[in-house]
Amino acid sequence: MAWFIPATRLDPTEQLPFLQQIENNPGKNFWLKGFAGSGKSVLLLHCLLIDKRKNPNSKAIIVLYTYSLIDMIKGGLPNEYANTEVLTFYQFRHKHENYDLILVDEIQDLPEHDIREICSKTTTNGRVIFAGDINQSIYDHSSSNDKINEILKIPQNATVTSLNKIWRLSRRIRKISAEYCNDRQNYEAAQVMDFNANVPVSLIKADNLEQECQWLWKSSKEYGDAGYVPAILISNKDSILKFISSVLKIENKPQLNFEWINNGEIQFNLINNHLESNGIKLQYLGNKFGSFKKAHSDNLVTIITFHSSKGLDFKTVFIPFLSHDYQIYGDLTIAKALFFVALTRSREQLILSHSGIKMHPFLTTTIISECTIKNAGDELRRIQNPLGGVNNGEDVVVI
């Protein structure tokens, strides 16, 4: 339960009043809105605790969008509720039973028919508590804010509560990510608690892709060895495979077996096993593969797609390969939403990088002005210097 926040540490002005609403209105449906880093997932788990405290035999289920988010949520469940069902939306479609409590995260990603089906699977006195942020809608089939209000019959049958404080992000990260937030005005008006105000956002410039890959691996490994459990966010799986291949080349290890890619399906379990057996402290997280628990216990670097990173957070986040020809997604609106998601995954350090002369158009003047710009070659020399880097596992900035 490393990321779970006990009730004694919740905010008394927003978070605790929401939980009081939940407790005072049994059977009432809720939609909890909040920007990235506002604590929505933590509050959903507290809703489960409230329900179980009142009725230990209550039949509850948690419904999520990605397997990586399931892995994180399971890690936050108290031991006594570890057997609570936690499923993806796709798995939930095949359930033919009703529940006293259905907790749903990332409602903005659901198509209309899924939202209606979820609402239909409560018991007579049961309810659904949704959480989500329209600004993080990253799928073509997503439902609009108005459509969600219509389905939930707000305000007659459901109550909307909005969180207006941001706990995870620094002011710097909020400023650069605001460029890609649909509700920019309210996002910029939200109160940032800013526990990491002095941590810089870095932009690393490499001469070429080979140097960028070498820097990315050496630097992320340095963070991993120091206990930061860093994540590398990459937009697509093809680029992930190319980076893993580069890491194996850098470490002089056997390359990937392309038989592990069957009919377009990448066998990431075999790739993770190959990395582990060759002593490479790197794992792919997503599609049921990889684990947060293993990342923390073994000081692994985690590599994950933008899509799979939604709902997650990491102490240190790398977003590499932001050169002019890097494709985040075919549809520009969704590409911007995905970039917003990626930028808001870091709770402490955010490190962007690109190679060559031209940067990605998403690296705007505003973003660049907020970054500390460094050269990949200089950073590689620093890492190779035995007097540089991180020492004694201290919680310090290493960039």
Predicted regions and their residues:
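Conserved RecA-like ASCE P-loop NTPase motor core of nucleic-acid helicases/translocases
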Residues: 31-70, 163-165, 178-276, 285-286
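N-terminal pre-P-loop "Q-motif" helix
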Residues: 1-28, 114
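Short, conserved "post-DEAD/DEAH" coupling segment immediately C-terminal to helicase motif II
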Residues: 112-126, 145-151
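Conserved coupling/interface region of RecA-like P-loop/ASCE motor cores
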Residues: 3-9, 136-140, 150-196
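SF2 helicase catalytic motif II
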Residues: 98-114, 128-130, 135-139
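Structural recognition of the conserved hydrophobic beta-strand(s) that form the central parallel beta-sheet
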Residues: 126-133, 162, 351-352
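Core RecA-like ATPase module of SF1/SF2 helicases and allied nucleic-acid translocases
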Residues: 38, 83, 88-96, 101, ...
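Inter-Walker segment of RecA-like/P-loop motor cores
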Residues: 60-100
